[in-house]
Amino acid sequence: MTMRTNCFLLLTVLLGILPMSNTHANDSIPKSVILYTPYTKISVSPGASIDYSIDLINNTDKLVNANLSVSGLSSSWKHEMKSGGWNLSQLAVLPKEKKTFNLKVDVPLKVSRGSYHFVVSAGEAQLPLNVVVAQQGTYQTEF
């Protein structure tokens, strides 16, 4: 009976410690570089131009020089990233600061209705975005 009691106590102690150490480990992992925009899912018409204002936030104690990219967009969806009037492919952010850049996405006139997903990346940081095209597009514009 003493052996059974000791095993039960050991099991109780181990089960009590494991969840706390697991939770603590997850909470201690900081997100060092973050991309942010409040407009993560929007609805537009074919032919629209979308202008995103995106913050690159550096929560580290070191300078971050991040490569910027957009993935997941078809070649018919033209896009450009700018800040200060310059086209960007890389952006430097001082420690504990943020920099804002603009992403312009042109929705083609000939596009099917539906939801389109793409990702903006800055180094390892990723910002998933979603554009919903509410109506079927055509080649013609209305005048």
Annotate each predicted stretch with a short phrase.
Residues 6-7, 20, 108:
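Intrinsically disordered low-complexity regions specifically enriched for long asparagine
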Residues 1-9:
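Bacterial N-terminal signal peptides that target proteins for export
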Residues 10-18:
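Bacterial N-terminal signal peptides
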